[in-house]
C-alpha cells in the first residue's frame, strides 16, 4: 500500500497536470529578490534570532524566513490596501501554506526562499500535486534511513495522516463534526476536498511512547480484510460523500492517477508506480508486478550533500520530459480497459508479497530455521523471546500471534495440497480416505 496521485487529488485538490516543480534553487542574492517580490526580507539579525532565542551558528544560513517573522509582518492585510499590497499578502500567505503544509522539513521553523521563488508568477502552472507526493516519498525514505535520537520527518503529513485514517484502523481518531463551510452556491472551486471529513477529530491525549507501541502491535497484526481499500468509492460513486459536495478539482485529473512516471520536486525524483498497488484502484493485482528500476543514485541527491548542483531543471531534464510525455500519453491515448479486481489473484499476490518482503516491524519470536521438524524445544528455549519471558521482561504478544497464524495457514495449505492429490473414490465407499 502507498499514497498515490489519487489520494493527492481527493485529499488536497492540488493539480497533477502542469509543469514539474523543478527549477534553479540558487539562493545568491535571495534577500534582494525577496524584497522585489514582497517588499521586505528578514535582516541577518532577524534570521539569527528565532522565537527570542539565539540560534546555534551554522556553516550555512538557510535562505528564507522564520514562520514567526512571516506572522509578525504579514498576519493582517490592511483594510485600505492597494491591489499591489493585496497581491503581496496573497503571495506571502501562499508561501506560508506551501512551506508549512506541502513541503515542511523536520524542523518546522522556516519557510525556504525557493518556495517563494516558485510563486514569482501566480499562474505558473506548476504540478503541485506530483511535487508534494515526490517530496513526501523522499521524506519517508529519509526517515526510514535515519537512526539518530533527533530524527524527524517532513513532507505533507496532513495527506499521509488522512490517507492512513481512511484506509487503516490504526491510530484513527473519531470524526466529531464539520464546521460550517464557506457558502457560495455559484463557486464550485470553493467547495472542500475529501480532507473535510476529518475537519474536527477527537484529541489523542495518551502517552506518546505507549501509543507508539500500540500502533506497532496493531500494524503487525492487521490483515487485508481489515483494510478499506477504496475509501473514496468506485465507478459512478467515486468521490461521492453524502455529508458535503466535493470540490471538482479533486476529480479533474483522475485520468492521470494510473500514470507510471517520475514525480519531481527540485532535487527529489521519486517514481509513481500504481501497478504495484492496483488493489487500491479496484483492479486486478498481478504478482509479481512489473519491475521498475527506481535508480538508487537519485536517492543520494539532496540540497545539502549536492550543493554544487543548483539548476535542477537542467540536471533532471530527462525526468521532466518523461513526466510531460506521461501526461500527454494518458490524455491523448485511449487506454485499454484494465481487468477488475479478482480476490483469488489478490490472495496469490499477498502470498507472494509476504514470502518475499518483510511485512512486520517487530522481530519474529522464533527463527524459521529452528522450527523445521522435528522441533528442538531446547533450542526454542534458548531463543531471545523466551529468555525475555522467563526474565519477566515486557514482551509483545504480537510475534507469537503472527507465528501461530503463519503455522495455521501453513497447515491449511498443506492439508489442501494433500486433498488435491488424494485420488477420488468410486462412490462405493472405497475412497482413499
Regions found by a protein language model. Name each.
Residues 1-433:
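Structural stabilizers in ordered domains
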Amino acid at each position: 500500500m502507498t499514497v498515490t496521485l489519487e489520494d493527492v487529488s481527493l485529499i488536497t485538490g492540488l493539480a497533477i497536470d502542469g509543469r514539474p516543480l523543478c527549477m534553479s534553487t540558487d539562493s545568491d542574492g535571495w534577500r534582494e529578490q525577496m524584497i522585489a517580490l514582497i517588499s521586505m526580507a528578514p535582516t541577518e539579525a532577524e534570521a539569527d534570532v528565532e522565537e527570542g532565542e539565539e540560534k546555534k551558528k551554522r556553516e550555512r544560513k538557510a535562505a528564507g524566513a522564520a514562520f514567526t517573522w512571516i506572522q509578525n509582518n504579514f498576519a493582517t492585510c490592511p483594510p485600505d490596501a492597494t491591489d499591489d499590497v493585496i497581491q503581496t499578502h496573497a503571495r506571502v500567505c501562499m508561501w506560508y501554506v506551501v512551506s508549512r503544509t506541502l513541503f515542511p522539513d523536520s524542523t518546522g521553523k522556516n519557510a525556504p526562499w525557493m518556495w517563494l521563488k516558485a510563486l514569482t508568477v501566480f499562474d505558473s502552472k506548476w504540478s503541485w500535486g506530483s511535487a508534494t507526493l515526490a517530496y513526501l516519498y523522499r521524506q519517508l525514505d529519509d526517515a526510514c534511513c535515519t537512526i539518530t535520537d533527533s530524527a524527524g520527518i517532513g513532507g505533507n503529513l496532513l495527506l499521509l495522516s488522512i490517507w492512513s485514517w481512511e484506509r487503516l484502523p490504526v491510530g484513527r481518531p473519531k470524526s466529531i463534526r464539520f464546521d460550517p463551510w464557506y457558502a457560495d452556491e455559484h463557486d464550485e472551486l470553493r467547495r472542500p476536498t475529501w480532507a473535510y471529513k476529518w475537519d474536527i477529530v477527537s484529541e489523542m491525549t495518551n502517552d506518546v511512547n505507549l501509543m507508539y507501541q500500540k500502533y506497532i502491535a496493531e500494524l503487525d497484526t492487521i490483515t487485508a480484510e481489515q483494510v478499506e481499500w477504496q475509501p473514496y468509492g468506485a465507478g459512478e460513486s467515486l468521490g461521492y460523500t453524502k455529508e458535503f459536495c466535493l470540490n471538482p478539482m479533486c476529480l479533474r485529473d483522475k485520468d492521470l492517477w494510473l500514470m507510471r512516471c517520475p514525480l519531481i520536486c527540485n532535487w527529489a525524483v521519486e517514481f509513481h508506480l500504481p501497478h504495484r498497488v492496483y488493489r487500491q484502484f479496484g483492479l486486478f493485482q498481478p504478482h509479481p508486478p512489473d519491475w521498475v528500476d527506481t535508480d538508487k543514485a537519485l536517492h543520494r541527491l539532496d540540497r545539502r550533500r549536492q550543493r554544487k548542483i543548483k539548476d535542477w531543471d537542467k540536471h533532471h531534464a530527462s525526468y521532466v520530459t518523461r513526466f510531460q510525455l506521461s501526461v500527454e500519453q494518458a490524455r491523448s491515448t485511449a487506454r485499454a480497459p484494465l481487468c477488475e479486481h479478482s480476490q483469488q489473484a489478490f490472495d496469490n499476490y499477498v502470498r507472494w508479497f509476504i514470502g518475499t518482503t518483510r511485512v512486520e516491524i517487530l522481530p519474529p519470536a522464533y527463527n524459521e530455521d529452528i522450527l523445521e521438524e522435528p522441533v528442538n524445544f531446547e533450542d526454542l528455549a534458548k531463543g531471545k523471546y523466551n529468555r525475555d519471558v522467563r526474565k519477566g521482561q515486557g514482551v509483545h504478544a504480537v510475534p507469537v500471534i503472527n507465528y501461530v497464524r503463519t503455522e495455521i495457514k501453513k497447515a491449511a495449505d498443506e492439508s489442501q495440497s494433500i486433498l488435491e492429490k488424494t485420488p477420488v473414490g468410486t462412490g462405493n465407499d472405497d475412497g482413499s480416505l
